[in-house]
Structures are given as C-alpha cells and as structure tokens.
Amino acid sequence: MEAEKWRYYLQPYINTSRHEGFYERDYTDQLDRFLSQKYTRAEKWIRTREFNRAQSNLEEIKSLDPNYKEVQSLLEFSQVEPIYVQALDLLEGNKFREVHDLLQPMLKKYPNQEVLRKLEEQAIERGKYRLGIISDPNIEGSEATMSAALQSAVISLIQKNNDPFLELLDRTNFEMLQQEQEAIINGTTNEAAVTKELLAADAYLKIVMTHVNENEGTLNKQTRRGWERYYVTTKSNEGEQVKKAQYKKVTYKEYTKQNEASYDMQLAMVERSTSRILWSISFHHEDKDEIHYVEFSGTGDLFSGNWRYQNKEHPSDHRKNDSRSMNRLVKANKRIQSTSSMRKDAISALAQKAAAHVNQQKLTKE
C-alpha cells in the first residue's frame, strides 16, 4: 500500500543522531500532506458514492494515524451506508428476512448504529409471522393426551430457536384459538372469535397424533431342564491330584418379554383467513425393547439340554455344548424399557422433527 511504502521510506531518517529534529519535522510535514491528500480523496469518493475506494484510503489513514480528523467516523459511514441502501431496497421489496440477515454482520461490528438498528426493528415488525398452535378437538384418548404433550414440546423447541420473525401466540390467547379450532377443522373461519386483529394468527399449526399403538408385553416364564458342570478332585495313576468335570441334572427358569410401540403424527399449517391448508406432513416413530435371561441357583457352568429322570440315567438324556451362551443369559439384563418411557422418547423425537420442519420454513409475512 502507498501509505506503508511512505512509512518505510521515511523511517530510517526519523531516529538519526545528527539533525534529529530536522528529520522529525520533515517526516511530520510529509506525513501531514500525505494524510491530507488521502483524506480529501476519501471525502470525494464518499460524495460520489465510491465507497470501496473511500474505505481503502481511510483504512490507510487509520493505520498511520488512528486519530486523524474524522477518519473513524468516515470509515464507519463508508461501510454502513452501502449496506443501509441495499437494506432499504430489500425492505421496499418486502424481503424482510433478507434485510435482517444483511444487517447482522454490520450491527455486530457497530452495535451502536441506531440507523441500522431501527431498520432491523422495522423489518422484524413488518415481517413478523404470528403462529397459533392448535389440536383437533375431535380426537380423544391416548391420541389426545399425547397431542397435548407434543404441542407443549414443539412450542418449547420453536421458542428456543429464537427466530425474531416467528411469534407464537401467548398462552393467554389460547382461549381465542380454541374458539376457532372447530371452525378451522371444519374448513371455515370464525371471525367473531377474533376480538383484536393484533392477536390474530397469520396461520395455525395443527399438531395431531393420528395413531398410538403401545404393546406392553407379558413376562413369559418357562422352567427348563439342563446340566450344571462341577469339578471333583481325584488322583491319577501317578498319584497327582487331577480335577475332573462332572455334570448333574438341574432345572432353571428362562424369561422373555418384549415391549413395542409405534406412533404417527400429522403436522399441518392452515391459513387463518381462508382455512386453506398451506402444507401437511406426517412423521412416524417406533420403538422396541426385549429381555431374555435365565435364573439359575447353581454356582457352576450351566448347559441346556434335556433329561427324562433327574436321579437316574436314560438313553434320551442329552446335553448341549453351550455353556458360554447360557452363562451370558444368566448375567443378562433383566430390566426392560416400559411403554410409558417409549412414549416420552417418542414425544421428544417427534417434537424435534416437527420444530425442525417449522423452523426450516423461515416463516415471514410478505
């Protein structure tokens, strides 16, 4: 850059021991003339709205003398003004969300820029989309119970997204929503229920559980016959002690259980003024858990199999070589996820899907 070249050219002469004052004054005079020329050009380019060229000059001036005249104010203006003009054009075209997104980097850089802040507020106010959350008054039972819980979860997740353009109607207005629900479901609008236009929603988000199926299984128990391995110590022909495996006939209990659940949710957005369905989407969630374990009172390794008589041999007696798998069943988990726990998981998962879908719409009033 020209300013840097000028700085490096003059720097060797600043601190010389001979005629130090002369060179210092000369450097200062030259720098003042240089900065004055740059500043005058920057003012000219701002008047002719050549903001990029003005910024380049002002940044050079600031690097040499941050306190030179009004360099900081002019630099801020040269950066803010083109963004402000562009945002005004977008605002006139009702591109409210684009206005907001365009202003954010500059507002972060200059948080006290009141002109930009007011423009942002105007865009948010004009583009704010008011959304009411409703359910189907005709559903009942577990579907109605889950729908209410799901609505609450969706509201919470949407609010956490902090979208400045999306406003959920306050719970104090839900009585008005309920008065309109039946009319909305039937394809009409109940204008008498709208006491204040400012409280009316632009659209309603209908959240309904259309299908709930929860199957809490029974704990199946079967008494089975098997073999327990134990060891006895004997002496070999050489007189050494040797452990020898023996098997005895035992019984054990085998348990199995399976819980499963499936849920279907419908999410639809209905325009308040016309009752027209703007979009509708369905989500499915299912879950399953099962347990399989063995209870055995012995201390040795367990083998499955079968036998006729416990106290005497029979040709039909047989023993499987499956102690590893049987021991795993002895140590297996005995706790199973309940369907009520599955329901909570389903509400959480479906609410996240619903809230994500709503947030992706980038709802803005046109």
Predicted feature locations:
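N-terminal leader/linker segments that initiate helical-solenoid repeat arrays
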Residues: M1-E4
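A structural "domain/chain start" motif
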Residues: Y8, T16-R25, Y39-E50, S56-E60, ...
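Extracellular loop and loop/strand-boundary signature of outer-membrane beta-barrel proteins
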Residues: Y27, E191-A193, T251-E254
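Short coil/turn motifs at beta-sheet boundaries
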Residues: I124-R126, L198-A200, E254-E260
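N-terminal segment of the mature soluble domain
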Residues: I133-S135, G141-N220, G239, S262-D264, ...
